[in-house]
């Protein structure tokens, strides 16, 4: 079964807190507080959240399937139970989803660009992540991160974001896993399983060799299954659309 990695659970400040252990992201570690100044998360009701990535002082990227009418965007956050002095909340001023996206196919062109209602300032815990200058290479070591479930049963959620390293696979592995591979998509994971993104990590970044290469879209259910990588929207393939929208061409179509 395929899982779109949005969750419908308790508010992040109310979820069961997982003590630091070997079961994080799934299978990673607590992120260093200085590792993720670009990482944001959003509430779009009292019960749902997704990850996001700050790409400049006024714009964030996430998955299109995370879109809801009301969204509250948190930046500069680390521990849900402790406030950083520089954390801020923003709301969408404008939201852009590919106009040529297939309406009934959630995984098609699963990317959304959001303009914040007010720019943010760079600070100790807030700074953008640059868009990629080159596409990623198969075999690259990639970093995943988020506040999503840290157990495959999706009954434990963390107070802090967790990080893990996974590998970028070739298209053969991806097609074997799911009998196909959507266009402009990357797949990444660990062949033996045990390390993966999970529910609540949707929309968060895939960072390969230091570059923002993917946006988490979907994966296996349960998470972290052997030979069942997760799928990420390939950011590099959408650069012309992203740059056109930011430049003011609001009717730009996706490739």
From Swiss-Prot:
Any one GO CC term of the record: extracellular region
Subcellular localization, as worded in the UniProt entry: Secreted
EC number, UniProt record: 3.4.21.74
Pfam families in alphabetical order: Trypsin
Positions of disulphide bridges: 31-163, 50-66, 98-254, 142-208, 174-187, 198-223
Tissue spec. comment: Expressed by the venom gland.
Sites where a glycan is attached: 170, 249
Site feature (Required for specificity) residues: 196
Biotechnology: Is used for the investigation of the last phase of blood coagulation. Due to its heparin insensitivity it can detect fibrinogen polymerization disorders even in the presence of heparin.
Record propeptide residues: 19-24
Active site, UniProt feature: 65, 110, 202
SMART domains (UniProt xref): Tryp_SPc
Leader peptide range in chain numbering: 1-18
Keyword flag Glycoprotein: yes
Family named by the database record: Belongs to the peptidase S1 family. Snake venom subfamily.
PANTHER family the UniProt entry points to: KALLIKREIN-1 (PTHR24271:SF47), KALLIKREIN-RELATED (PTHR24271)
Function as written in the Swiss-Prot or TrEMBL entry: Thrombin-like snake venom serine protease. Cleaves Arg-Gly bonds in fibrinogen alpha chains (FGA).
Assembly description: Monomer.
Protein name per UniProt: Thrombin-like enzyme batroxobin
């Amino acid at each position: 079964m395929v899982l779109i990695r949005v969750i419908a659970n308790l508010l992040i400040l109310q979820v069961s807190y997982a003590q630091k252990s070997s079961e994080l992201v799934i299978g990673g570690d607590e992120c260093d507080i200085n590792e993720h100044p670009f990482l944001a998360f959003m509430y779009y009701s009292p019960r749902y959240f997704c990850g996001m990535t700050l790409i400049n002082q006024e714009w964030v990227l996430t998955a299109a399937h995370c879109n809801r009418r009301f969204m509250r965007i948190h930046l500069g956050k680390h521990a849900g139970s402790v406030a950083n002095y520089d954390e801020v909340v923003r709301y969408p001023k404008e939201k852009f989803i590919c106009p040529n996206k297939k309406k009934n196919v959630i995984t098609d062109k699963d990317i959304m660009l959001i303009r914040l209602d007010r720019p943010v300032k760079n600070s100790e815990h807030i700074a953008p992540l640059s868009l990629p200058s080159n596409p990623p290479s198969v075999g690259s070591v990639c970093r995943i991160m988020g506040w999503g479930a840290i157990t495959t049963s999706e009954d434990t959620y963390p107070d802090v974001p967790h990080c893990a390293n996974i590998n970028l696979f070739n298209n053969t592995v991806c097609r074997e896993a799911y009998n196909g591979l959507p266009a402009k998509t990357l797949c990444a994971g660990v062949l033996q399983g045990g390390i993966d993104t999970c529910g609540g990590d949707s929309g968060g970044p895939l960072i390969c060799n230091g570059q923002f290469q993917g946006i988490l879209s979907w994966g296996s259910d349960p998470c972290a299954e052997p030979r069942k990588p997760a799928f990420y929207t390939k950011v590099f393939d959408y650069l012309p659309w992203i740059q056109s929208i930011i430049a003011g061409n609001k009717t730009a179509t996706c490739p």
